[in-house]
Amino acid sequence: MKKLVNDVHAVVRETLEGFALAHPDLVDVHYSPDFVTRHAPKAEGKVGLVSGGGSGHEPLHAGFVGEGMLDAAVPGAVFTSPTPDPILEAPTAAAHGAGVLHIVKNYTGDVLNFETAAELADMEDIQVSTVIVNDDVAVEDSLYTAGRRGVAGTIFVGK
């Protein structure tokens, strides 16, 4: 299978740049740390919705940022959870006075890093709650996973 990749070390950054160029009316892309927010912010007094996870399954997660969906998305490296630092920046940008809800897929790295970011946000007086999505019916108990993962159902939770 042929992939459209210029540089494997810059694939996430280049994907975000392309997404921003294709949808400037929908999203704003922030760099260092990398995350995506809605171009038109949600009204004050509304809960901000933030999700994220490893890159490599685009348009997930940035493709679900916009009106009626996520307020921010945090991409990790390819197939790798984002670290707490960019996860912390996203709720800061997505908070509209009513707290933030992290929508997290049940992958160990995602859960650990989003929970760590939620604790850090709490220290900055940003109220963060977390929903862990574990809708994967293919895996219940396995030596290789921590239970059911979050897959397609994550989209509906964000909606």
Describe each model-derived feature in a short phrase:
Residues 1-49:
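N-terminal amphipathic/basic leader segments beginning at the initiator methionine
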Residues 2, 47-54, 70-73, 99-108, ...:
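Short glycine-rich or small-residue beta-strand-to-loop segments that form or flank ligand, phosphate
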Residues 35-44, 88-98:
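Glycine-rich phosphate/diphosphate-binding loops that line cofactor/substrate pockets in enzymes
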Residues 44-52, 61-74, 137-141:
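Gly-rich Lys/Arg/Thr-decorated short loops/hinges at beta-loop-alpha junctions or inter-strand turns
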Residues 57, 64-97:
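Glycine-rich oxoanion-binding loops at beta->alpha junctions
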Residues 58-61, 84-88, 109-115, 138-141:
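Short glycine/serine/threonine-rich phosphate/pyrophosphate-binding segments
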Residues 111-125, 144:
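Short Gly/Thr/Asp-enriched flexible loops that form oxyanion-binding sites at enzyme active sites
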Residues 133-159:
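Short alpha-helices
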